[in-house]
A protein has these predicted regions:
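Flexible, acidic glycine-rich loops studded with aromatic residues
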Residues: 53-59, 66-213
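Active-site neighborhood of glycoside hydrolase catalytic domains
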Residues: 1-72, 77-91
Length: 213
């Protein structure tokens, strides 16, 4: 069960009488971040009752009175709320969804700076599942990408494609996704990119026949 924690605009709840009453009743203090943590814990309890696992798209701070359960899987992408290194130190299971180079945003974006979020297959090939980067200069990993040591707590990666027309998905992913898959599933051995991309091109010809392109 997926929760997009980064989309929670907690400022909207600071001066809501009903929210303030609820926080007082449940001894949550005055910090709405504690309300958010309370919500995440409650959701995790509900999800587990249905024999499911909760996936959390980061969004919660490292500091807080209410402890976030360690059986929650955290998808870490922005390196803003809770650094991947801290998530590992704190015992969480993590999926690498690093903005650079795993995002593919190719048109229709209201935020102009995010239009940079399209990286070449070669750039994706230089990434590994223990590495986080970001194109935004306000993030901690902008100048110094975070390369973590190999750990079983990082269980994989995810390529993220959004804010583009449906017919644009296959053209933008067809030569990037195979490279990403190679770096996730075959991270122990690495041939030169030029040699590997020959395989991608051959398989892409087969894809063209399948989809009649």
């Amino acid at each position: 069960f997926h929760i997009g924690g980064d989309e929670a605009n907690l400022d909207l709840y600071k001066n809501v009488p009903e929210i303030n009453s609820f926080m007082k009743k449940n001894n949550l203090g005055k910090d709405v971040n504690e309300l958010f943590r309370y919500f995440l814990v409650r959701m995790n309890e509900i999800v587990k009752k249905h024999n499911k696992k909760m996936f959390l798209w980061e969004g919660f701070r490292r500091e807080g009175e209410i402890e976030i359960p360690r059986d929650v899987v955290v998808f870490a992408f922005e390196t803003m709320y809770h650094l991947p290194s801290h998530l590992i130190e704190d015992g969480f299971t993590v999926v690498n969804t690093s903005w650079t180079p795993l995002y593919l945003v190719n048109g229709g974006v209201k935020q102009p700076r995010a239009r940079r979020a399209v990286w070449s297959p070669q750039t994706i090939y230089s990434w590994n599942v223990w590495r986080w980067e970001h194109w935004w200069d306000q993030t901690p990993v902008y100048k110094n990408p975070m390369q973590l040591e190999e750990t079983s707590q990082i269980i994989g990666g995810q390529m993220c494609s959004w804010e583009q027309a449906g017919e644009a998905e296959i053209p933008s992913l067809r030569k990037r996704l195979p490279v990403f898959i190679e770096r996730v599933w075959n991270n122990k051995e690495k041939m030169p990119f030029e040699d590997f991309f020959v395989r991608v091109e051959k398989n892409d010809l087969k894809l063209s026949k399948i989809i009649n392109d």
